Curated annotation (Swiss-Prot):
Entry protein name: Dual specificity mitogen-activated protein kinase kinase 7
Protein's job: Dual specificity protein kinase which acts as an essential component of the MAP kinase signal transduction pathway. Essential component of the stress-activated protein kinase/c-Jun N-terminal kinase (SAP/JNK) signaling pathway. With MAP2K4/MKK4, is the one of the only known kinase to directly activate the stress-activated protein kinase/c-Jun N-terminal kinases MAPK8/JNK1, MAPK9/JNK2 and MAPK10/JNK3. MAP2K4/MKK4 and MAP2K7/MKK7 both activate the JNKs by phosphorylation, but they differ in their preference for the phosphorylation site in the Thr-Pro-Tyr motif.
Annotated source species: Homo sapiens (Human)
GO terms, biological process: apoptotic process; cellular response to interleukin-1; cellular response to lipopolysaccharide; cellular senescence; Fc-epsilon receptor signaling pathway; JNK cascade; positive regulation of DNA-templated transcription; positive regulation of ERK1 and ERK2 cascade
Regions annotated as coiled coil: 2-30
Active-site residues, record numbering mapped to chain: 243 (proton acceptor)
Residues of the site described as Cleavage: 44-45, 76-77
Disordered: region residues: 18-76
Top-level taxonomy: Eukaryota, Metazoa, Chordata, Craniata, Vertebrata
Phosphothreonine PTM sites in chain numbering: 275
PTM annotation (N-acetylalanine): residues: 2
Length: 419
C-alpha cells in the first residue's frame, strides 16, 4: 500500500477516535450539568408492572421546586410526526421497550426488590467508561452498596446503540462468573442506569497505584478470567467485545476478576464482525487499523486476543509497549510498521507466559490463535489450577498505595439527580 494512502487511512481513524473522545467528554459534561445553586430535581421513573404502568414517584421537596426540563430528543422517536423512521430506529425502540419491561427492580442476593432511582443514595463518582459514568451508590432498603452506570439518552443513533448493546450483554450474562453482574436497570426520559455489583478497582488504576509491574501470578489468574469471559461472549451470545484493555478489567477484595463495559461490543455474523467501531487506538489490532477493504470490515475475535496481549505486556512491565507516542496516529503507525512487542527476557517471566503473550501478539491475524486454542495453552492450564491468593494481594496493594485520583469523589453539589 502506498505511504500516502496508509497515512490517509490512519488520519481518518485518528479523527474518528478523537470524535469518540469528544462525544465521551460531552456525555460526561451533560451528566454533570448541575450548578451548586440549582436544586436537584427528583427523577421521574416510568415502571412497567403487570403489563400496565405505575405512576412515577410523587416525592419532591416543596423547598426545592423542580426546574423546567430542557428539551431533549427521545430515544428512537422522530423529530416530527412526518419524519419516516428507519428500520434501525424502530429496532432500537423495540429493544428498549423489551428492556423497559424489566426495569424498576433490583435482584440482589437472590431477593427481588421493587425500586426506583430515588431509592439509591449517591456516594460519589467511581469513574467513566465508553458509554457514561459510574457511581457508587447505596440501596436504602437493604443497605447494599452497588455500582450504577449512568448513560445519557439522546437523539444520536450511535450512542443509543451503545447503550442498548451494553444493556443487552450484561442482562444476558448473569450466568458467567467472569463478567460483572447486573442487579437491574432504571430508565428515565433522559438517562439509562445499570445497577451492577461493586468491584474494587480496575487493572489500569492498580498499575498506577503500584507505579510498576503487576506480578505474573496475578496476571495468570487475570488471563484465565478474561479469556473465559471473552470465550463465553462468543460462544453463548455471538458477541465480540472490541474494547479489551486494563481499564475494563475489574478486581475486588474477594479476589474476583471480571470483564466490563460492553458499549462497543459487536454481533458476530458467521463468526465475523461486520461493523466498525473505533475503540481505543492503543490496543487496536493491526487488521482493524488497516483492513483489506475499509468499506467491509471483516475481522473476528482474534482482534480481542491482540488487545489482551497488549494489555498483558503493559501490566507485566508497568509500561505501555508503544512508548513516546503523542498522538493516536503515531500509535497506529507503530502497530502497523513495527514488530509486535514481547515480554522482556530480563524481567524473569516464565517461558509459558512469554509464549502466551507472543501467540496473542502474532501480527498476522490468520495465524493468531482463537480462544479454544488459547485455553489449551500451558500458561492457562497452569493458572486454572494453581492456587493464588488474589484477594490478599489486592487488599495489600490497596492498603499500602495511594489512589491515582487525588480528589476521591466529587463534591456533593456536583452529583447528578440522586438524593
Amino acid at each position: 500500500m502506498a505511504a500516502s494512502s496508509l497515512e490517509q487511512k490512519l488520519s481518518r481513524l485518528e479523527a474518528k477516535l478523537k470524535q469518540e473522545n469528544r462525544e465521551a467528554r460531552r456525555r460526561i459534561d451533560l451528566n454533570l450539568d448541575i450548578s451548586p445553586q440549582r436544586p436537584r430535581p427528583t427523577l421521574q421513573l416510568p415502571l412497567a408492572n403487570d403489563g400496565g404502568s405505575r405512576s412515577p414517584s410523587s416525592e419532591s421537596s416543596p423547598q426545592h421546586p423542580t426546574p423546567p426540563a430542557r428539551p431533549r430528543h427521545m430515544l428512537g422517536l422522530p423529530s416530527t410526526l412526518f419524519t419516516p423512521r428507519s428500520m434501525e430506529s424502530i429496532e432500537i425502540d423495540q429493544k428498549l421497550q423489551e428492556i423497559m419491561k424489566q426495569t424498576g427492580y433490583l435482584t440482589i442476593g437472590g431477593q427481588r426488590y421493587q425500586a426506583e432511582i430515588n431509592d439509591l443514595e449517591n456516594l460519589g463518582e467511581m469513574g467513566s467508561g465508553t458509554c457514561g459514568q459510574v457511581w457508587k451508590m447505596r440501596f436504602r432498603k437493604t443497605g447494599h452498596v452497588i455500582a450504577v452506570k449512568q448513560m445519557r439518552r439522546s437523539g444520536n443513533k450511535e450512542e443509543n446503540k451503545r447503550i442498548l448493546m451494553d444493556l443487552d450483554v450484561v442482562l444476558k450474562s448473569h450466568d458467567c462468573p467472569y463478567i460483572v453482574q447486573c442487579f437491574g436497570t432504571f430508565i428515565t426520559n433522559t438517562d439509562v442506569f445499570i445497577a451492577m455489583e461493586l468491584m474494587g478497582t480496575c487493572a489500569e488504576k492498580l498499575k498506577k497505584r503500584m507505579q510498576g509491574p503487576i506480578p505474573e501470578r496475578i496476571l495468570g489468574k487475570m488471563t484465565v478470567a478474561i479469556v473465559k469471559a471473552l470465550y463465553y461472549l462468543k460462544e453463548k451470545h455471538g458477541v465480540i467485545h472490541r474494547d479489551v484493555k486494563p481499564s475494563n478489567i475489574l478486581l475486588d477484595e474477594r479476589g474476583q476478576i471480571k470483564l466490563c463495559d460492553f458499549g462497543i461490543s459487536g454481533r458476530l455474523v458467521d463468526s465475523k464482525a461486520k461493523t466498525r467501531s473505533a475503540g481505543c487506538a492503543a490496543y487496536m489490532a493491526p487488521e482493524r487499523i488497516d483492513p483489506p477493504d475499509p468499506t467491509k470490515p471483516d475481522y473476528d475475535i482474534r482482534a480481542d486476543v491482540w488487545s489482551l496481549g497488549i494489555s498483558l505486556v503493559e501490566l507485566a512491565t508497568g509500561q505501555f509497549p508503544y512508548k513516546n507516542c503523542k498522538t493516536d496516529f503515531e500509535v497506529l503507525t507503530k502497530v502497523l510498521q513495527e514488530e509486535p512487542p514481547l515480554l522482556p527476557g530480563h524481567m524473569g517471566f516464565s517461558g509459558d507466559f512469554q509464549s502466551f503473550v507472543k501467540d496473542c501478539l502474532t501480527k498476522d491475524h490468520r495465524k493468531r490463535p482463537k480462544y479454544n486454542k488459547l485455553l489449551e495453552h500451558s500458561f492457562i492450564k497452569r493458572y486454572e489450577t494453581l492456587e493464588v491468593d488474589v484477594a490478599s494481594w489486592f487488599k495489600d496493594v490497596m492498603a499500602k498505595t495511594e489512589s491515582p485520583r487525588t480528589s476521591g469523589v466529587l463534591s456533593q453539589p456536583h452529583l447528578p439527580f440522586f438524593r
